[in-house]
Amino acid sequence: MLPGVYTAVKKDGTVYYRASITCKNKHISLGSYALESLANQAYTEAEHFLRDAFVPLEYALAHRSALSFDKTVTLINFRDNGVYIKTPIYLRKNYFEYYLTSTLVLKFDIDDLFYYSSHRIQKRGGHLFVSDYGMQYSILSRYGIKNHGVPGKDFLFVNEDPTDYRYSNIKIINPYAGVTRLTENGKTVYQAKIHINGYFSLGIYEQDYLAAIAYNKACDLAKGMGIAKEFPVNYIDFLSASEYADLYSDLILPEKYAAYLSSFLHR
């Protein structure tokens, strides 16, 4: 058997090959392969990357063949920083980098290390998310940003680097669903609107939380009219239950909204 390789058997009796290496008294699994030669190649690459401290991460990622992308990042970080992390993380001073690809590297505060060392980031349709207990959560939710938040509309990257997710670089513009911040005559105002079959404007408000309450009320009316759609709910943390109820009761939605809802019942 070639160095770093041992055999294993699947439930159906198929033989496959596992590669592993020991470094700094830690036994590291390198993956499973259909061919012994590939498993040995993974071992050879891992040995080279771990032994030669002058091999930079970018070079290792560009020249690996059998070793997986994630495992390469893990090994180089272990070599340089002495910490074994299963996800593709490389530690820097006071922050860390999460490698999605060789060209897409995200920066996070060190406070998030524990979370992302046990949660893999995935990208789909331009959105970054993690899976937790069978559910998918946008990484933006950790900043209090609503799902599918849009850069420039709902939040800003302060240094204009869209890969820098350190807390100091995230500025929330619009924390509420159904609310858009606008500037009219040099003054900041907030438009509430609901999406059912296209957008319907619910009015302009001087405070974002009032627009958020208007949106909540519009959602409640829509559901009360039998419109079967899941609407996100806004929570205004600084209002007591009675304060929220008073504002909710006093807030009047546009008269046309009731007619708009009725139009869906006659289709």
Across the structure, where does each feature detected by a protein language model lie?
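Boundary-flanking segments of nucleic-acid-binding domains in nuclear regulatory proteins
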Residues: 1-267
